[in-house]
């Protein structure tokens, strides 16, 4: 903890919490299923390299990223585990992905053609995972085009189809009991259709697997489970799971949280990330004075405010203006006025012991109080994913 004293604004990564979450997922899937956490987008704001190293040491098997530059960063950090690139790889970057021994998602013939050229040029084999369109309508091979796509891949003997995958559209938003009831009753009401949509997608995915199997093509690694699927639906685990937000101790949704806690008494996710800054100034403000840009906050009485050196440049959403709180000396201090690019003002009238360079907690615990990513997301009108992912990468991440 000593190195924290040297930082003006910083993010803490709790190693014990991350290990807890890793063990929780391992307990859910068993030893034979590949545990492949998503560390894309700077590990959802948690620091990709530091998080990846902790995860692998604690029992994760693979790492999932979105782009080649992320894979480059991991390899430069000495990480040798399998890396699966889930996002589109530009033609100019395909050779780099092959050199790095990465698995690539595949759904375009253009990618396959360029991959074929790269394997010849480099005298290396390439490994791909087919992405199947089952109902999310993002990237993926349409079911009717699957066999034609596979036949095209066969033209390139240096390319191996190792995996087949898909991605759910709303599995984190559904009620497990409703979904199960739909399967039994085949009810046509809209709410039940939406509840069963992940299961509709799962049936499509199984159909794709069967098409390949009937054609004599055995794909060894089948995967479709994100955080919610891994936690609630064992039938989605197949050979590999890809937890994302829950790996970092945050719930994909309230529905997932409620259902999981009913199914697994005593098991819990532990948030990994805390975000803190320091008071830069404390000043008195007279009743009737305005605070901040736009004069959106007017002091109703004499008050004391603290100036914090943090703003929307750092990833602290402007939507927190006049709404959000920070924690100072274990108490809530309300934001006064607009969140600025580099500065935020908070009311410390009722925290008389507050001093310059005291810690202000943006996200996390301070004493008995806590500000969660879900609370911040609700204020900003977004999701917890965005709250942590948008924290500026230049802010130091410190493992504690």
Where are these regions (language model features)?
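Active-site anion/phosphate-binding pocket segments in diverse small-molecule metabolic enzymes
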Residues: 2-15, 19, 69-70, 89, ...
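Active-site phosphate/pyrophosphate- and oxyanion-stabilizing loops and adjacent acidic/basic residues
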Residues: 23, 151, 385
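Active-site-proximal beta-alpha core segment in soluble small-molecule metabolic enzymes
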Residues: 2-5, 9-15, 19, 27, ...
């Amino acid at each position: 903890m000593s190195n924290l004293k040297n930082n003006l604004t910083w993010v803490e990564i709790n190693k014990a919490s991350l290990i807890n979450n890793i063990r929780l997922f391992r307990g859910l899937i068993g030893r034979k299923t590949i545990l492949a956490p998503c560390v894309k987008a700077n590990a959802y704001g948690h620091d990709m390299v530091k998080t990846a190293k902790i995860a692998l040491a604690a029992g994760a098997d693979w790492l999932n990223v979105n782009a080649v530059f992320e894979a480059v960063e991991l390899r430069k950090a000495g990480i040798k585990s399998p890396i699966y690139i889930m996002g589109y790889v530009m033609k100019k970057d395909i050779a780099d992905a092959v050199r790095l021994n990465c698995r690539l998602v595949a759904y375009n013939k253009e990618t396959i053609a360029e991959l074929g050229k790269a394997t010849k040029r480099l005298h290396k084999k390439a490994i791909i995972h087919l992405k199947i369109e089952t109902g999310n309508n993002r990237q993926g091979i349409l079911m009717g085009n699957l066999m034609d796509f596979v036949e095209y891949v066969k033209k390139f003997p240096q390319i191996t189809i190792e995996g087949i995958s898909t991605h759910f559209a709303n599995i984190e938003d559904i009620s497990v009991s409703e979904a199960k009831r739909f399967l039994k009753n085949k009810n046509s009401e809209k709410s039940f259709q939406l509840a069963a949509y992940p299961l509709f997608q799962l049936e499509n995915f199984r159909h794709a697997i069967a098409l390949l199997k009937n054609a004599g093509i055995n794909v060894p690694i089948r995967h479709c489970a994100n955080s919610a699927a891994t936690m609630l639906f064992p039938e989605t685990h197949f050979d590999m799971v890809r937890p994302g937000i829950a790996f970092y101790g945050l719930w994909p949704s309230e529905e997932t949280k409620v259902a999981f806690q009913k199914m697994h008494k005593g098991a819990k996710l532990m948030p990994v990330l805390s975000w803190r800054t320091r008071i830069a100034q404390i000043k008195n403000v007279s009743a009737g004075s305005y605070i901040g840009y736009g004069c959106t906050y007017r002091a109703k009485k004499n008050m004391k405010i603290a100036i914090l050196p943090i703003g929307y440049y750092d990833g602290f959403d402007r939507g927190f203006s006049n709404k959000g709180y920070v924690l100072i000396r274990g108490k809530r201090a309300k934001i006064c006025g607009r969140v600025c690019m580099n500065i935020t003002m908070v009311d410390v009238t009722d925290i008389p012991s507050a001093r310059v360079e005291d810690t202000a907690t943006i996200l996390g615990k301070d004493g008995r109080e806590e500000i969660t990513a879900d609370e911040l997301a609700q204020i900003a009108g977004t999701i917890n994913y965005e709250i942590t992912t948008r924290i500026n990468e230049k802010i130091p991440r410190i493992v504690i």
